[in-house]
């Protein structure tokens, strides 16, 4: 490995790195109650409002989903940020 490769190496692209950092996954153990998916539209609207204060994003660039995996519910929030340019 050359000195230049060690110094500059292969760095991940900024958009890909931002996507990885902004993928937020929250899991909680299901308590057997009713479905909690009815809060997703409100959550998505509030996320858009908060994120829009700091970054200009399209509403289509924010995805909120809830999946059941065994005894857990996984809430996934994906936010695609615009490229700096």
From Swiss-Prot:
Classification via Pfam families: MinE (PF03776)
UniProt cross-references to InterPro entries, sorted A to Z: MinE, MinE_sf
Top-rank taxon: Bacteria
GO biological process: cell division; regulation of division septum assembly
Keywords attached to this entry: Cell cycle, Cell division
Gene3D superfamilies: Cell division topological specificity factor MinE
Transmembrane segments: none
Signal sequence coordinates: none
Keyword Cell cycle on entry: yes
HAMAP family registered for this protein in UniProt: MinE
Family: Belongs to the MinE family.
Known function: Prevents the cell division inhibition by proteins MinC and MinD at internal division sites while permitting inhibition at polar sites. This ensures cell division at the proper site by restricting the formation of a division septum at the midpoint of the long axis of the cell.
Protein's UniProt name: Cell division topological specificity factor
Organism lineage: Bacteria, Pseudomonadati, Pseudomonadota, Betaproteobacteria, Rhodocyclales
